[in-house]
Design a protein with these regions (language model features):
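Feature responds to low-complexity, polar/acidic, surface-exposed segments characteristic
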Residues: 2-42, 53-72, 79-110, 119-139, ...
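Conserved glycosyltransferase catalytic-site signature
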Residues: 193
């Protein structure tokens, strides 16, 4: 099961790194998105599978593939992938277990953020700020996924060169195989759904 989780997390990393078109704002499994015709056909199957697994959940039945994805939305996706928990029971235990003053305990994402912070999968934008509504970058998504599968144990993904370390690790693992390294900045800038 642990290897399956690692495989699924890396598969998601590849989808996000190559397309940056993945969203946390999907509807419940088995339902149609009211804007599914805007989903890039090459990613339809991945979206369908991850929705069916409960990894993608959301509100209003919209997928919004052209919208940017927030740090809170990615936290929800990473939590579901890392734990296999698509409910809220475990997550509810962590709503106040973080140092972030901008993550209220009653926010829908508070438990995800708290769990991932304690698991050392996410970091704040500062020691006390998470910026949940801020757009996430491809580098940040890759860092979270790599931490979820066991990388960055020695805090390599910190400091002024953290993006270089993330890209280097992802390249070594083959996640960025088809992306020219001179274009990492363009490709991994803002992640869209």
């Amino acid at each position: 099961m642990r290897n399956l989780k690692k495989f699924l997390a890396l598969a998601l990393a590849m989808v996000m790194a190559f397309s940056l078109m993945v969203t946390a704002n999907a509807a419940h499994a088995g339902t149609q998105y009211n804007d599914e015709d805007t989903v890039t056909p090459a990613f339809s199957e991945a979206v369908e599978v991850l929705t069916g697994m409960g990894v993608f959940q959301g509100d209003s039945g919209s997928f919004r593939p052209a919208s940017n994805i927030t740090r809170a939305e990615v936290a929800a996706i990473i939590y579901r992938l890392a734990t296999g928990d698509t409910g809220t029971d475990k997550m509810d235990l962590y709503t106040t277990r973080h140092p972030f003053t901008d993550v209220r305990s009653d926010a829908w994402y508070a438990g995800y953020v708290g769990y991932l912070y304690n698991a050392k999968i996410i970091k704040g934008t500062t020691a006390t700020t998470f910026n949940p509504a801020g757009n996430v970058t491809g580098y940040e998504v890759l860092a979270m996924i790599l931490r979820a599968v066991g990388y960055d144990k020695n805090d390599e993904f910190t400091g002024a060169t953290w993006t270089v370390e993330v890209a280097s690790t992802a390249t070594t693992l083959g996640i960025l195989r088809d992306i020219d390294s001179t274009h990492y900045g363009d490709t991994l800038h803002l992640a869209s759904r």
